[in-house]
């Protein structure tokens, strides 16, 4: 067990000692596969209640956490109460990397999170870091439900995970103290980015000066002038009120912000066929629900920002095309790192739905 897993285990142990989490006996952590006899035995189970566990790093009021809770509710309802999914948000049982590894090991049944923290474990997930990929959210969602999704599932499976679905928080947008309405306006812009090589390369390709910084440090960075701008999905802009320190919200739509629902293969293998079917069905329905929730919240969040006095800028098609052309090299970098198959599939799927 490595250091990160140990850190998670300590937090998890504390919850157990408080009686929050019962022993994960049912998850059968030690079993990576089940033989035919095991399957027959499990299929014969009747009346046995099952408790599973879901976690996310995000705050309780985010779409990510709401996605998780909706999924848990649907699983319980569809199983007539026989399967209960206990949910933990706000990093209660670990940060993104910790809960991801715990899910691989079967200590957590389900994890809800963006793909960015998964890239260090599953490099192929970087295909979703391709910049300026989608003209609108409808195309993005069709692609995330299509052949690309089917191929990504295989890479997750290799890491003892089941990719159940991908919802989203919409696009990542930009807030700035500098007015931006053309490509040249990005030149020299000190913008906070995630610690993600492809995100950093994207902003450099536009001429900006990207500065990786912890999310918790962004507000003070804007306030003190350490950075001029930042980029996030609207939800992550609203909650900490970054807009209070910014004159403009620029709808750059530069990256989709995907939210995955993943399951531990070990836990899924320990379920009966009927129980797994319930999980798959609930995940599909909750994915659609989460996307609809994102859409419903976007207008409200835009209104909050606008009412604060921050000006909203919608970039014209010419500027968006210029940004896309300028950042083509990032696509090449991703292809060099993960191979051409997924990038080619992404291009083909985008062309199909455009």
Q: What do these predicted ranges mean?
A:
Residues 32-138, 148, 157-354:
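N-terminal secretory/targeting leader peptides
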């Amino acid at each position: 067990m490595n250091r990160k897993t140990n850190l998670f285990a300590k937090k998890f142990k504390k919850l157990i000692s408080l009686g929050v989490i019962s022993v994960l006996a049912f998850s059968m952590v030690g079993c990576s596969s089940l033989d035919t006899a095991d399957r027959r035995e499990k299929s014969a189970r009747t009346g046995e209640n099952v408790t599973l566990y879901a976690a996310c790093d995000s705050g309780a009021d985010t779409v990510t956490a709401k996605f998780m809770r909706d999924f848990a509710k649907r699983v319980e309802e569809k199983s007539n109460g026989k399967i209960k999914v206990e949910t933990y948000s706000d990093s209660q049982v670990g940060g993104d990397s910790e809960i991801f590894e715990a899910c691989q090991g079967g200590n957590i049944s389900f994890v809800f999170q963006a793909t960015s923290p998964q890239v260090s474990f599953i490099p192929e997930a970087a295909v979703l870091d391709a910049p300026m990929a989608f003209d609108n959210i409808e195309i993005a969602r069709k692609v995330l439900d299509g052949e690309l999704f089917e191929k990504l599932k295989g890479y997750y499976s290799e890491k003892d995970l089941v990719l159940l679905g991908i919802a989203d928080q919409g696009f990542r947008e930009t807030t700035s103290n500098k007015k931006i309405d053309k490509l040249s306006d990005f030149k020299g812009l000190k913008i906070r980015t995630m610690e993600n090589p492809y995100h950093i390369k994207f902003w450099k390709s536009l001429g900006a000066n990207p500065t990786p910084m912890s999310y918790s440090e962004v507000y003070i960075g804007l306030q003190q002038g350490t950075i001029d701008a930042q980029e996030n999905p609207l939800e992550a802009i609203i909650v900490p009120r970054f807009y209070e320190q910014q004159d403009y919200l620029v709808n750059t739509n530069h990256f989709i912000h995907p939210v995955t629902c993943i399951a531990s293969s070990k836990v899924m293998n320990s379920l009966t066929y009927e129980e797994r079917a319930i999980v798959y069905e609930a995940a599909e329905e909750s994915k659609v629900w989460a996307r609809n929730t994102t859409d419903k919240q976007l207008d409200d969040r835009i209104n909050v920002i606008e009412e604060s006095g921050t000006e909203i800028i919608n970039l014209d098609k010419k500027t968006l095309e210029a940004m896309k052309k300028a950042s083509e090299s990032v696509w090449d970098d991703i292809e060099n790192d993960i191979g051409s198959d997924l990038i080619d599939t992404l291009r083909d799927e985008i062309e199909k739905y455009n």
